[in-house]
Amino acid sequence: MWAWCLMPNHVHLIVVPADTDGLRRALAGVHRRYAGIIHARRRRTGHFWQGRFGAVAMDEAHLAAALRDVSLNPARARLVVRAPDWRWSSTRAHLTGKDDGITGRAPIRERFPGFAQLLAAQPDADAFARLRAAESIGRPLGDDRFLARIERATKRRLTPRKRGPKPRTEADANDEGQLSVLSP
């Protein structure tokens, strides 16, 4: 787990699963156990987390925006004045370099050796908006090369297609008005 933040009504995670089913396997069990504990304490049932589970595959360029979002979320929500003061987050581990038993610090340290400067930098509103949009529609976030690589790996088209009806082809025009007869 590269980064995380447990908020009162939701959780943010930046994880890189080892295989295609790794994320589901890891989170399903955690969700069941944690929700079960809280429901038992509060003697309630029903949905536990706010909204649905959202996941965004992203390239390295968008990782910085995601890290800022996850790390600064408690301060933006006015739960603390400074993000490192929030106990239920990986932010402190990344800033101090101390092991918290949860956070994989090395991948972030390698990519962002100036983690404090990353958090202090002016927020990129466009990157944040792209991150939220990608999360809401479930599409990967990255440049054309990244998207092409993901499309090849998954054998699925991931880039949005043009809206509206498909353009007519010459074959469609030739078929128009012809009646097909099937005989037994």
Name each region found by the language model:
Residues 1-7, 16-184:
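Short Pro-Cys-Gly-centered "Cys-loop" motif that presents a nucleophilic cysteine in a tight turn
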